[in-house]
Amino acid sequence: IGSDQVADLDGEPLGKPGDHARAVLQLRRMRGRWVVFQTAVAVVCQASGFEQLDLAPVRVRFRDLSDAEIEAYLRAEQPYDCAGSARSEGLGIALLEAIENDDPTALVGLPLIRTCRMLRAAGVQLLASAPPGAGLE
């Protein structure tokens, strides 16, 4: 199983900024706008030859962030390894006004609903093979 994500701002890909200065620029460009985070997932089983890819788009509307909010967020989270400089599972959720998608885990970076669907297609019976204590009691 592999997954990765890129932010799409009006057709322009915004990847992982890598440093503070690039993160500031990304967040300034996205403030007050809709951005689509495209999360790709792949399931490959070499033994059976199964391969499947899927894409989980997530539309996100950023708040109209002030420069001070952007600086405070970046100093606290340092999301320089996150597409679009936003880590929604942390303080990054405070940057957002709205999220639209069909898989709430996709924005975090691994669309689990799609991944489970792909694993079932590969013949993996997720619930049948769950060990005692796996939270399915």
Model-derived features with residue positions:
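Anionic-ligand binding patches
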Residues: 1-137
